[in-house]
Amino acid sequence: MTTPRLLTDDQMRRFVAHGYLCLRTELPDSFHRGIFERFDALIGAEANLNPGNNLLPAVPELNRVFADPVVRGALTSVVGPDYVMHPHRALHNNPPGSDAQRIHKDSYWGYLRRVRNHRCRWAMIMYVPQATPLERGPTGVIPGSHYQSQRPDETLMPEVASCLETGGFLLIHYDIWHRKMKNHTQDKRFMMKFEFIRMREPDGPSWDHADPDWRFGELPGLDLSAVWRRQWDWLRGAGRQDAPVNDIDAAGLVDIDPRRRLAAINDVARNAAAARAHLPALAALL
């Protein structure tokens, strides 16, 4: 088995902030054409044989996807080297002219209690055996929304289309808001999703790590820099790293403008000692 292709620091920072990455397997196009044909035989226009959780026994060739070094490296990077595959999986069809879904978070299959977590304990792979340009109805995601328990305001956190190449896959934090977009073409579009679980707390970086500093480029809608920094440190196996802050904008904590309010909250979150004086204002926000 080939060595996993681990994510870089920049890719991990983007995953922490945005909650997803668009990647591609190293498997040849001929393999993906074969998978497309197998999916078509199961759930194409003339068939209704969706195997549900029995997808791997029905299409055992899919094991090659999960042995792919890019897939293994991506999963190792975000959920640790001893991750496990959950028994729930699904094969989805987006036929020509089908309508878009409503934006949603997936439920945790088999769990009666809420297990959502900002930390990356669950991840999902969404693999497509054919290219998914915008007109073919790719998966739409709201970058950064894995930190939001309620559907985000579209004016603050807009949706983007995760257009993939043939054999591409979407690596997502399990709690990200997403949906199937409308297929405007006469082409069939299939997607399979598998879930993966972290088995232990990180005790060090599990990706190709060189730079311990948190930095980011493109903002995914809202600036949650204090949250991102904490997740980054947790994934590195590091303790809490308080950062010096200037005077905290106390009035901003209760301002009607969500961006000013969030900036003030970020300042408080960066330094626990400075936050103590503002606990009443923070409690009032709950």
What residue spans do the PLM features occupy?
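Non-heme Fe(II)-dependent double-stranded beta-helix
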Residues: 1-115
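Catalytic core of non-heme Fe(II) oxygenases with the double-stranded beta-helix
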Residues: 99-163, 205
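Non-heme Fe(II)/2-oxoglutarate
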Residues: 179-251, 257-270, 275
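Short inter-helical turns and helix N-cap capping residues of alpha-solenoid HEAT/ARM repeat scaffolds
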Residues: 256-257, 286
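Short sequence/structural elements of tandem HEAT/ARM alpha-solenoid repeats
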Residues: 276-282
